Amino acid sequence: MGPGLLTFTSTPPMIPDTLPRSVWPITLDDIAAARDRIRPFVPVSPFRGYPVLDAALGNDIRVWLKHENFNPTGAFKIRNAFSLLTALSDEERRRGIVAATRGNHGLGLAYAGKTFGVPVTICVPLGNNPEKNEGMRALGARLIEEGKDYDESLAVSERIVREAGAYLAHSTNNAHIIAGAGTMSLEIAEQEPNLDALVIAVGGGSQAVGAMTVMRAMRPHVRVYAVQAAGASATHDGWHARAPRVTATPATTFADGLATRSTYELTFPALCDGLADFITVTDAQIAHALRLLLRTTHTLVEGAGATGLAGLLALKERLAGQRVGVVVSGGNIDDQTLRRVVNREI
């Protein structure tokens, strides 16, 4: 067993919390239990360094990329989906699940639903990524296209749940979802125990809260930085104001996986308590990071998946000389958007 490596049986070790559950929605025990449940379905994803990327970053930074874009369905959200479906009762599964998504949450739920024979209904906004829509349908999900953005599609999903009595699988406001996201950081803590910092993109905040929960318990020296698209900055703005926020205008970013316009009650208090800092990056910065990943790692990522690296580029003076982990959260970019990025139209 390598240094810093932990293994959990079906009954993980008890590790005391450092904050009340009212602030932190999950514990390390919850994440360990989620990992045990999803282990048969979700392989450990690579955590890999690239000397050519280090050279491009400069400032004596060494970076490791957590390749969630290599997962089944191409994103970290499959962890969340299996964490949720393996925790539901038989009766909850029988009634089916309903969710709103811009794609990756829905793909994960459709994949897990097909695995367990659970009916899945997904609500997406009009004009959603057509390739993500195609993928969800291919996995057997019922797709409802309604609303101008994620938040309006979420309202549609809540209406369907009230009418049909199904289970609402919220992409953030669910402890099983957050615990599933935390399994990624549990792997990171074991794969590279000597990190100084993690840089993580934030939409609703499940990744970041999962990461902070793990690092506070296992690697308390690791500082977690959050980054959000400037065109969808409700959580960033609320964090700096120390107050929950909902914006009336639709999110505007090609990083559709981050395109939300509100904070969420289960994640926002922990984000306020635990983050080292929270920054925004423009679509141009995200597109630059995406092209850099294509050139230096030869892996395909979507806008949300490149946002962590965009954040590291913005923070590279502050993180000079450090060992930094960056989550590549997904790779489901459609061909039209990829063409625009490669042609420097974004």
Question: Whereabouts are the PLM-identified features?
Answer:
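PLP-dependent amino-acid enzyme catalytic core
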Residues: 8-346
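Low-complexity, intrinsically disordered Ser/Thr/Pro- and acidic-rich segments
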Residues: 1-9
